Amino acid sequence: MRDYLKKQISNPTTSNIKSFDLTLGNLCNLKCVMCNPSLSSQLLAEANLNPTLQSRYGGSYDQKDFDWPKGDDFVEWCNRYLPQAIHIKFTGGEPFLIPWIHDAIESIPDNQKAKCVLHFTTNLTVVSDKIFESFKKFKAVWISVSVEGTHSTHEYLRYGHSWDTLSKNLKSISEKNIDNLIFKINHVVQTPSYHSILEMTDFFDQLKMKIHPIMLKSPRHYHISALTRESKQYFLDSTEEYTGLNLDFIKFVRSVSQEYIEQNTTLTKECIQDLTHLDLVRKNNHKDIIPEKNIKIN
């Protein structure tokens, strides 16, 4: 085994690889406030149209650098190697926007599909009945849906999305009753959406869907250290007796809220400044979304 690993490191081959983690460029239809142009073609276009935003992302980006998943070479590579897979993870961008995804997973022989697990991370702006029908032949399919709060909070954070569309698509997939589908929520724990966690948890408790927490690391000014102590204490008090479906999620948020209970006002100022800058471009107002008590500076 050691010799095999050394050989793979010095001269890697794909002929025996069974697990693939594919980040499919930056093709995306949303402009999430915590994201960047390398993961969203919409953010890249927005930054190029509004040069004042380029400093937000550390400089300019060229879309041509992220278009490689559209190339014939990569599509042919997928068609050659994915049929041997027992695990494939698709992220983006937004993987369900990639036009050849259905053909790629259909190219896997049926006997191999029965051994293969698929995993998609998606904003669920679009649902392809054709793709979901093909999922039934696989061993298991994980769908992780990115959600930041509810209603206007989600729409502000995942700019370009509609809460009504998300709700409709969640319901549509649930009603398909795909036995091998594991359908869960990903939530980024961060300052701009922190106030909506309680309502979001209640919403997904009712849908019987579990929430997986992702602790935000970048941009650092959206870290929950930017929140007031008062806002975090309110969450802790409100969830002290919570025993619902998403107890593990709530325990995680409680833990990090306690760990970062004190406010870092430098981050608060940077958070407000960044959101204000973005609001000027998008004609939004974060003050309509985030309660003043959450980001006030005494």
Which role does the model predict for each range below?
Residues 100-107, 129-136, 196-198:
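Distinct, well-ordered alpha-helical segments
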Residues 1-65, 81-82, 248-298:
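N-terminal pre-core extensions flanking Radical SAM catalytic domains
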Residues 17-27, 38-69, 83-98, 111-128, ...:
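Core AdoMet radical
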Residues 119, 140-144, 164-297:
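Conserved C-terminal portion of the radical SAM core fold
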Residues 75-81, 105-111, 134-136, 173:
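Leucine-rich repeat
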